[in-house]
UniProtKB/Swiss-Prot annotation:
<comment type="similarity">
    <text>Belongs to the KdsA family.</text>
</comment>
<protein>
    <recommendedName>
        <fullName>2-dehydro-3-deoxyphosphooctonate aldolase</fullName>
        <ecNumber>2.5.1.55</ecNumber>
    </recommendedName>
</protein>
<dbReference type="Pfam" id="PF00793">
    <property type="entry name" value="DAHP_synth_1"/>
</dbReference>
<keyword id="KW-0448">Lipopolysaccharide biosynthesis</keyword>
<comment type="pathway">
    <text>Bacterial outer membrane biogenesis; lipopolysaccharide biosynthesis.</text>
</comment>
<keyword id="KW-0808">Transferase</keyword>
<dbReference type="InterPro" id="IPR013785">
    <property type="entry name" value="Aldolase_TIM"/>
</dbReference>
<keyword id="KW-0963">Cytoplasm</keyword>
<dbReference type="GO" id="GO:0008676">
    <property type="term" value="F:3-deoxy-8-phosphooctulonate synthase activity"/>
</dbReference>
<dbReference type="GO" id="GO:0005737">
    <property type="term" value="C:cytoplasm"/>
</dbReference>
<dbReference type="InterPro" id="IPR006218">
    <property type="entry name" value="DAHP1/KDSA"/>
</dbReference>
<dbReference type="GO" id="GO:0019294">
    <property type="term" value="P:keto-3-deoxy-D-manno-octulosonic acid biosynthetic process"/>
</dbReference>
<comment type="pathway">
    <text>Carbohydrate biosynthesis; 3-deoxy-D-manno-octulosonate biosynthesis; 3-deoxy-D-manno-octulosonate from D-ribulose 5-phosphate: step 2/3.</text>
</comment>
<dbReference type="InterPro" id="IPR006269">
    <property type="entry name" value="KDO8P_synthase"/>
</dbReference>
Amino acid sequence: MQKIIKLKDLKIGNDLPFTLIAGPCQIEGLDHALFMAEELVKLTTRLNIPFIYKSSFDKANRTSVNGARGLGIDKGLEVLAEVKRAFNCPIVTDVHSENQCAEVAKIVDMLQIPAFLCRQTDLLQAAAATGKIVNVKKGQFLAPWDMKNVHKKLESFGAKDILLTERGTCFGYNNLVSDMRGLAIMAELNTPVIFDATHSVQQPGGLGGSTGGERKYVELLAKAAVAVGVAGLYMEVHQDPDNAPSDGPCMIRLDNLERVLTKLKKYDEITKEK
């Protein structure tokens, strides 16, 4: 029987209706965060889709030194706390160093380990020590079966609730490919698996000083993942992605999200019907 993780009133499991993890790539300010959260909460409530709000206080791995990194941990956590207070929705954000974990855990419901840092033992240990759910993104450089070692590290440090997220694999230069077998392989670890549909269309460093992407393939890959069967979908969303400070080429447009989610929910129901 597949493991089910409980978060507030949500249940996250590979055999359950998918949970949506969504929000803008980085926190741009309080007003923008509240606007995005309100729109996403209203939409997912209307469609009866379990929802977790995601946004980053620091984009620490930008391609260029000139790339916008975000509000930073202090102001960023203040914004996330306001979102949580206003809408009572679960929150996830990423951590980049061990000394951030305890502070971030005071505000959020789930800690996320970035793909580039997924093998950093000290970071995994610090995240596990918070007692929060830990979502680890599979490194673009790792095979899906290698995530068993990451999973074992977290378990050895006492983590009880672990999510693994597929976000594409390096395929030559400036390109990623999604191997849908990886979703099933990681699920064999008896842990909920998430598919990151927006970062999977990234073209890392593809614009020279920033990351490119192929937004037009987000829906296609999300359909494929839902057809395989996943516990959740991860989508970064923006009302004006072409003018977003980071990952604009990958993010799905807010005004297109309802149409996409409506389709995905139908696919999900077919995949998981008894």
